[in-house]
Swiss-Prot record:
HAMAP family: Dephospho_CoA_kinase_GTP_dep. It comes from Methanosphaera stadtmanae (strain ATCC 43021 / DSM 3091 / JCM 11832 / MCB-3). This is GTP-dependent dephospho-CoA kinase. Belongs to the GTP-dependent DPCK family. GTP binds at D45, D64, K66, E121. The keyword Nucleus does not apply.
Length: 169
C-alpha cells in the first residue's frame, strides 16, 4: 500500500490537467474520443453522473458513492461489470492498482467497468495515468471549481513524479 505524505497534499490538490468550469464545454471533444474508440476514465461520482447525463459513457468509472464526502445514491446502469475494492483515504492499495490495470486492459465501450471504492477514490488518478494508453482521457472533479480533463500523454511525467514520492507501507 502507498500512502500520501502530508507535504504532497497541497500539490495534488492542483489539477493534473486542464480545468473546465463544466463538462458541457468539452462535450464535443469527449464524443470525438469515444467515436475514435479511445479510452475515457471517469473518477468521482459527480463527474461520472454528469458524463452519463450527456450520454457520454466512460469505459471505466471509479466511484465511492459520495460527492464532497456526503453519501449519494445513483444508478450506474450502463453495465453489470461492477468491481468492489477497499481503498482508505490518502492511500493507493495494491488491490486498487491491480483493478485499475485489469480494467484498463479489458474495458471497452461495449464492456465498460465500474470500480466501486469503499473508502476514497481520489488518488486512483495516479495509477490510471501511469497505466492507461497515452491517448486516454481521464476526468475528475475539482471541488467548487469544475472538472479536470487529463490527457495521459501530457500528465504522465508529473504523475510519475508524484507516485515516486508516495510512502510504501
Amino acid at each position: 500500500m502507498l500512502t500520501l505524505p502530508k507535504y504532497l497534499r497541497s500539490e495534488l490538490k492542483k489539477p493534473l490537467g486542464q480545468l473546465y468550469k463544466s463538462i458541457d464545454i468539452i462535450e464535443e471533444k469527449l464524443h470525438q474520443q469515444l467515436s475514435e474508440d479511445k479510452l475515457i476514465i471517469s473518477i468521482g461520482d459527480a463527474t461520472t453522473k454528469n458524463l452519463i447525463k450527456l450520454n457520454i459513457q466512460p469505459q471505466i468509472c471509479i466511484v465511492d458513492n459520495k460527492i464532497e464526502r456526503e453519501p449519494v445514491e445513483h444508478k450506474l446502469t450502463h453495465t453489470d461489470n461492477l468491481v468492489h475494492v477497499n481503498n482508505p483515504a490518502g492511500c493507493i492499495t495494491d488491490e486498487l492498482v491491480k483493478i485499475c490495470i485489469d480494467s484498463i486492459n479489458t474495458a471497452t465501450s461495449n464492456n465498460p467497468v465500474i470500480i466501486e471504492v469503499k473508502g476514497e477514490e481520489d488518488l486512483a488518478v495516479l495509477p490510471c495515468i501511469l497505466n492507461a494508453p497515452k491517448d486516454t482521457f481521464i476526468l475528475y472533479g475539482q471541488p467548487k471549481e469544475g472538472v479536470v480533463l487529463v490527457c495521459v500523454n501530457e500528465a504522465f511525467n508529473k504523475a510519475k513524479h508524484f507516485y515516486k514520492q508516495l510512502n510504501k507501507e
